[in-house]
Amino acid sequence: MGKSCKVVVCGQASVGKTSILEQLLYGNHVVGSEMIETQEDIYVGSIETDRGVREQVRFYDTRGLRDGAELPRHCFSCTDGYVLVYSTDSRESFQRVELLKKEIDKSKDKKEVTIVVLGNKCDLQEQRRVDPDVAQHWAKSEKVKLWEVSVADRRSLLEPFVYLASKMTQPQSKSAFPLSRKNKGSGSLDG
């Protein structure tokens, strides 16, 4: 196990951010249970990557954003990844995710961060307000992975989080500027 990764989980209020984490990590979320508004919370989980290595991930569960509120500045420092959550039964929550992605892009200081997007409540088909094709098209144009999930089906949560942990902890690829002993010239600055 390497370093602990920091992941910020964010989205509009009442889209299921805390429920997703509770179900993923503990398997104990009861659908329909009373919702308690989150101020800010930290969850620590151990996720097996696609390489078979267990990695520790610290999830920063943020307060649901309302009425144009922005993500607090501290959410951008030293962050390795983001989970942006919207509810498939709320077009407004999807639009909030679009804005959050732009905010992250402006604030990440050229640092490589992994972003996954979750469309929660996909089991509520009759209440759907976000077209899955539109959402996938947006995700593709933004170069992020998007999954539709349901807290009621814990298995639907596994793939996105395995992907996230795997991507954040993958070994560094070879440098684009390999150091080679076969230099042209001597490298001397003497005339």
UniProtKB/Swiss-Prot annotation:
Pfam families: Ras (PF00071). GO terms for molecular function: GTP binding; GTPase activating protein binding; GTPase activity. Widely expressed. Coiled coil: none annotated. It comes from the Eukaryota. A motif (Effector region) lies at residues 35-43. Keywords: Cytoplasm, GTP-binding, Nucleotide-binding. Residues 169-191 are annotated as: Disordered. InterPro entries: KBRS, P-loop_NTPase, Small_GTP-bd, Small_GTPase. GO terms for cellular component: cytoplasm. Changing residue 42 to D: Impairs the interaction with GFOD1. GO terms for biological process: inflammatory response; lung alveolus development; negative regulation of canonical NF-kappaB signal transduction; Ral protein signal transduction; regulation of tumor necrosis factor-mediated signaling pathway; surfactant homeostasis. GTP binds at residues 11-18, 61-65, 120-123. Residues 1-191 are annotated as: Small GTPase-like. In contrast to other members of the Ras family, the members of the KappaB-Ras subfamily do not contain the conserved Gly and Gln residues in positions 13 and 65, which are replaced by Ala and Leu residues, respectively, and are therefore similar to the constitutively active forms of oncogenic forms of Ras. This suggests that members of this family are clearly different from other small GTPases proteins. Atypical Ras-like protein that acts as a potent regulator of NF-kappa-B activity by preventing the degradation of NF-kappa-B inhibitor beta (NFKBIB) by most signals, explaining why NFKBIB is more resistant to degradation. May act by blocking phosphorylation of NFKBIB and nuclear localization of p65/RELA NF-kappa-B subunit. It is unclear whether it acts as a GTPase. Both GTP- and GDP-bound forms block phosphorylation of NFKBIB. Belongs to the small GTPase superfamily. Ras family. KappaB-Ras subfamily. PANTHER family: NF-KAPPA-B INHIBITOR-INTERACTING RAS-LIKE PROTEIN, NF-KAPPA-B INHIBITOR-INTERACTING RAS-LIKE PROTEIN 2. NCBIfam families: small_GTP. Interacts with both NF-kappa-B inhibitor alpha (NFKBIA) and beta (NFKBIB) in vitro. However, it probably only interacts with NFKBIB in vivo. Interacts with GFOD1. This is NF-kappa-B inhibitor-interacting Ras-like protein 2.
